[in-house]
Structure formats: structure tokens, C-alpha cells
Amino acid sequence: MARDEVRRILPADIKREVVVKDEKAETNPKWGFPPEKRPIEMHIQFGIINLDKPPGPTSHEVVAWVKRILNLNKAGHGGTLDPKVSGVLPVALERATRVVQALLPAGKEYVALMHLHGDVPEDKILAVMREFQGEIIQRPPLRSAVKRRLRTRKVYYIDVLEIEGRDVLFRVGVEAGTYIRSLIHHIGLALGVGAHMAELRRTRSGPFKEDETLVTLHDLVDYYHFWKEDGVEEYFRKAIQPMEKAVEHLPKVWIRDSAVAAVTHGADLAVPGVVKLHKGIKKGDLVAIMTLKDELVALGKAMMTTGEMLQKSKGIAVDVDKVFMPRDWYPKLWKEKE
């Protein structure tokens, strides 16, 4: 049976168009710190590492090691990997720690080795695995960190890479919170022979991939040493991505300089502050609020659609949830009440 070519597309791969509301708006170069111009100490404070987790330790242990290696106060990871699982583990640092929330809607990709408990013709394996694309129902495993309630999850694609006897190597793109071990168990049941997961590696977490940004713990130790002991920051800088990388896939609203400080001081984003935005924003969407220099200001929930933000002259456009930008990067440009 011929293997169909599978389109490997996650939600993070969706291309979005930008529409401009105010073409005359400009940004003052004296204010803010664009990602590419941040001093190394600031780059760390607002950074995220695309870490290659080794098999063995828990995700929590790996994050603790990163904190110790880099002498940090805070760090958090995006999407727990079981101890035996290796691969892409985004680790957000210091003031960027909460940005991992943005990775939830982005989708994840794994390469898995499934071992069947009986012989099955190749064409049947391919046909049955294809049936698992789309919405599936799962119950988290016994040792899961969440309550064991039935829930639906999306499988965006399954691409069989190799079949050798009872071993099936495949690549799978899934919604966050999908259990690959459970998926393999159900594929085995559907094939009538049973199956278990022999090996698993995460190859993507939204915008974070197995590419030149992926670093190991050994790399981190070396690069940190080069910077601290030898004054060479180039490698260490490349090992840390700006927090803006973690929101690449989100719908965005860009705001004028005069609105930035208000948002960093706790105000929701009002329509007059909007300069441009992505098409297709729906009410309730998680959106990233950006400056005109492409700095992340905050994450929030859209209170209007793209069309409403373009048409209206007042009202709340985004209900701000998490603010990342410090209050002193842009000046207060509103008048205090007497």
C-alpha cells in the first residue's frame, strides 16, 4: 500500500495577515529594548531556552539544573516530558517564566517508536493509524499529573516513517495534553494485537524545533563559562531566545508608544491604542500585545474581533492577563487626575 504524503502542519504554522489601522503611527527609538538590542544580562531576564532534554531526569529536575548552571532565581518549562522522554523542552527564564502559557495552543510534535505485540500487514497498520487523525478521546494515564477524566484531544497528523517487523516508527503532531503512550495503546487495540511505546522524543513545541537554536545542558555549561570566564558572550546569547519567540504563533495586536506604559501599569488595552493587528482575531482568543518595535508587552484575551477593533473608536480591545514588559521601558504619557 502506497504511503500518502502527510502535511505536517501544527496550529503554530498558520500564517496570519496584518491589517493596519493607523498608517501614520511611529515609534520613538529612544524608548524600549527591541529583542536584538538587549544587553546580555537583560537578554537572560527576558529569555527562553530551546533545551534538548536528555532521557533520565524529570522535566522539573532539568529546570532546576538550568537555574543552578545559570545562577537564576526563576525558570519554568513549557509542557512536561516524562523522565524517559527526550527532546524539545522550552525553558523560560526569570521575568519571562510565565510566557510558557503561550505555547499551549501551538501544538506539539513527537517521533515515537511503537512495538506491536503481534504481526500485522503493513497496509493494515497504515490504514488504522490514519484513522487516528482528527479528534480522539483520551483518559490520562494512571501516573499522570492531572485528574483522570475523559477528554478530547486533536491529532493533527500521523506520518509513518518506517515499519520493520513489529516496530513502527512514526511522527505525530498533536494538541497539548495528548498522551502518546495512550495513543499507541489504542492503536494497538484497534490493530487487534496490542502495542506499547518503546521510545519517544519530542521534536517540536510550537515555534521551538530541532534546529540550530536547540541546546543541550552541556552546551549551556560551556557557553555560560565562555561568557563569565572569557568574556565571550556570542555563544551564550545564541543559546537563549528572546521571549518574543514564544509568541511567534499567536495572533497579535501592535500598539502605539503612548499606550505601552498604561498596559504595563495594569490597564486593559483600549481601542485608541491599537495601530495594527492580525486578521481573524475572535473574541476570547489569546493574543500577544506588541510594541511597534516588536517587543512583547503582555498577553491577554481579545474582547473584540479584528473587524470590531478596526471599526470602533472606543472600548476595551484586549483584557490584559499577564504583563511582561517592565514599567520603566516606556514613559507615562497620560495626565494624572488632580
Curated annotation (Swiss-Prot):
Entry-linked Gene3D superfamilies: Pseudouridine synthase, PUA domain
GO molecular function: pseudouridine synthase activity; RNA binding; tRNA pseudouridine(55) synthase activity
Pfam families per the UniProt record, alphabetical: DKCLD, PUA, TruB_C_2, TruB_N
Enzyme type, top EC level: isomerase
Entry-linked SUPFAM superfamilies: Pseudouridine synthase (SSF55120), PUA domain-like (SSF88697)
E.C. code: 5.4.99.25
InterPro entries, per the entry: Dyskerin-like, PsdUridine_synth_cat_dom_sf, PsdUridine_synth_N, PUA, PUA-like_sf, PUA_sf, tRNA_PsdUridine_synth_B_fam, TruB_arch
Catalytic residues in the record: 82 (nucleophile)
Gene Ontology process terms (BP): box H/ACA sno(s)RNA 3'-end processing; mRNA pseudouridine synthesis; rRNA pseudouridine synthesis; snRNA pseudouridine synthesis; tRNA pseudouridine synthesis
Record's keyword terms, sorted: Isomerase, tRNA processing
NCBIfam families in the record: CBF5, PRK04270.1, unchar_dom_2
Function description: Could be responsible for synthesis of pseudouridine from uracil-55 in the psi GC loop of transfer RNAs.
HAMAP family: TruB_arch (MF_01081)
The protein's name: Probable tRNA pseudouridine synthase B
Organism: Thermococcus kodakarensis (strain ATCC BAA-918 / JCM 12380 / KOD1) (Pyrococcus kodakaraensis (strain KOD1))
